[in-house]
Amino acid sequence: MTTTAETITRVLVPDRQRADFVDALFGLSFPLQLEPCVFAVASELSSDYHGGYWAFQSLGNGGFYMAPDVDRGFEVSCENGFEGTLSSDALGITACLYAYSHLSFGEGAFAEVCAEQYHLLREYALD
């Protein structure tokens, strides 16, 4: 039996659709919990990160991530010992994975959404 795995696609969420898009996925928990957590993780991972505009990406498998909208790398240092340079996209994916994992240990529907988003984004990252 042969199975063919399809590549997970990503699409930039247009500026005019950003608010509605994240509201449909996360509700008020996006601006109150998820977004600040992602920004904090990015700051912890990279002393090069000092804020800025983030691009929102919708994944073909239902996942979502956001990444700094700049064309440069970020020096990172992680608690697991990794030190190196990540692209802005890779920093965003990493920060979102950390945030989803952390927030998935809460209670209620938002924690479940974060757990699901973690696995969808991880699937994309490993693709």
Language model features by range: what are they?
Residues E6-T9, V22, L59-G62, E83-L86:
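Short, functional N-terminal and low-complexity linear motifs
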Residues T4-D48:
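Negatively charged, low-complexity tracts enriched in Asp/Glu with abundant Ser/Thr
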Residues D23, D48, S58, D69, ...:
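Compositionally biased, low-complexity repeat tracts
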Residues F26, A42-S46, L97, S104, ...:
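Hydrophobic, Leu/Ile/Phe/Ala-enriched alpha-helical segments that form helix-helix packing faces
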Residues S29-G73:
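Amphipathic, interaction-prone secondary-structure segments
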Residues R18, H50-Y53, A90-C96:
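Short runs of predominantly hydrophobic/aromatic residues within well-ordered alpha helices
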Residues T3-R18, S104-D127:
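Low-complexity intrinsically disordered segments
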Residues V76-C114:
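Compact, glycine/acidic-enriched structural inserts
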